[in-house]
C-alpha cells in the first residue's frame, strides 16, 4: 500500500490566488490534511474550492517547555506586561500595542506598571522611535532572550497580530500563568483562550476596550491570581505527550 501523505499546513489568510489550485490538488492527492486548528477547515475549502471535508483533522502545536509555573510563585509576579515576538510590523503590529500602552501610562490609576518587549526584527528601530515620539517612560526592549524568566515574572501578555497560525508564544504565556490579552484576529485563538477564564479576546482595532480590559486586570490582584492559575491548567491541554499521542493515533489509523 502507498504510504500516507500528510500535509501540515500553517494558516495564511492572504494567500496568493495562484496557490488556490495547489490547495485543491493537495487535498485530492493526500490521505489526510492536518490543520493547526479545526476552525481552518472552512478557510481551506474556500481557498481550494472544495466541498468534501472528510480528509481534515486538526492537531495543535504543543507547549514549548517542559515546565509549568508552580502556583506558589504566582504571588511573586511583578507589575509587568510582556510581549514576546518577532519585530515584524506587517504581521505582529506591535505599533498597536505601543499605542495601547500610551493609554496605560497616562492613566494615573495604573502607576508602577511596565512593558517589556522580548525579541528582535526589522521593525525594531521603528518601535524604538515610536516609544520616543509617544514619550513612553516605562517600556524596555530586552532583545533576543530566553523568554522563560520573563513569562515567570510578568503578569499580563499582549498580542496584537494581524494573523497567526497557532502562536507558540500564546501557549507559552499560559503555561507560565502570564494572562494573555489578544486582538481577536484568528479563529484558532478561540481554541486556546477561554474568554474571561484564562485570558481575553478583544475585537480587532478596539484600542479602548483593549486598554480597559488590561486596566481591569491590573487593578484586581485577586482575579489575576485566579486567572493565572486557570491559564496554567488550561495549557496542559497542549503538553507534548498529548500532542504526540494525537500524531501516533493518526499515523496508526
Describe the predicted segments one by one.
Residues 209, 216, 223-237, 249:
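A short, well-ordered alpha-helix in the C-terminal region of glycosyltransferases
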Residues 39, 62:
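Carbohydrate-associated surface elements
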Amino acid at each position: 500500500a502507498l504510504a500516507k501523505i500528510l500535509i501540515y499546513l500553517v494558516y495564511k489568510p492572504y494567500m496568493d490566488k495562484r496557490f488556490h489550485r495547489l490547495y485543491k490538488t493537495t487535498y485530492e492527492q493526500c490521505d489526510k490534511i492536518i490543520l493547526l486548528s479545526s476552525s481552518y477547515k472552512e478557510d481551506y475549502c474556500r481557498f481550494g474550492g472544495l466541498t468534501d471535508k472528510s480528509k481534515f483533522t486538526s492537531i495543535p502545536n504543543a507547549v514549548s517547555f517542559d515546565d509549568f509555573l508552580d502556583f506558589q510563585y504566582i504571588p511573586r509576579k511583578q507589575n509587568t506586561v510582556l510581549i514576546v515576538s518577532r519585530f515584524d510590523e506587517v504581521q505582529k503590529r506591535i505599533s498597536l500595542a505601543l499605542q495601547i500602552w500610551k493609554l496605560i501610562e497616562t492613566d494615573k490609576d495604573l502607576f508602577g506598571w511596565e512593558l517589556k518587549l522580548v525579541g528582535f526584527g526589522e521593525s525594531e528601530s521603528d518601535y524604538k522611535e515610536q516609544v520616543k515620539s509617544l514619550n513612553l517612560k516605562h517600556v524596555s526592549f530586552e532583545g533576543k532572550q530566553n523568554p522563560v524568566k520573563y513569562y515567570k515574572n510578568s503578569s499580563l501578555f499582549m498580542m496584537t497580530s494581524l494573523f497567526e497560525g497557532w502562536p507558540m508564544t500564546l501557549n507559552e504565556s499560559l503555561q507560565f500563568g502570564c494572562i494573555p490579552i489578544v486582538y481577536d484576529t484568528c479563529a484558532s485563538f478561540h481554541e486556546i483562550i477561554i474568554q474571561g477564564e484564562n485570558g481575553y479576546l478583544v475585537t480587532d482595532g478596539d484600542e479602548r476596550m483593549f486598554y480597559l480590559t488590561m486596566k481591569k486586570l491590573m487593578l484586581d490582584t485577586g482575579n489575576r491570581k485566579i486567572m493565572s492559575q486557570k491559564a496554567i491548567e488550561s495549557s496542559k491541554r497542549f503538553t507534548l505527550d498529548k500532542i504526540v499521542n494525537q500524531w501516533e493515533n493518526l499515523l496508526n489509523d
